[in-house]
């Protein structure tokens, strides 16, 4: 396989994103980002997952509150700046072995997987073994989802990234 540079397509973090990006690069196990709208929270998360999936073979998940939100916001949505689907900005074709459109799942040539899911249906994921999880729009998601997966991440020496805009004093506010 040819040498592939990640982050893909020359992406670099914006000034606001640099401190968080550094924490992710240095292996922080739990990162919470309470950023304003349009700050690039999912952008950082996608590029982080791409790198982590190449560094360690495992299952990586990106959860939004509802699976349909994940499909619309990240699987089907086209980045107007690049003309690529948002997930394609972080995961170049050269590292992908298979794309499952129905399951919103990528299988990479090194056998890692990355999948978009809804945190509202976390009970359907019993028996799974993620090593990296992003909880996007975490302020709107089911707080029980992270509580459910936290022991699995601890056992697997995994990591979690919680990203959202603050939406009042709720579970995300307390996490932050």
State the predicted function of each range:
Residues 1-176:
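Phosphate/NTP-binding elements of NTP-utilizing enzymes
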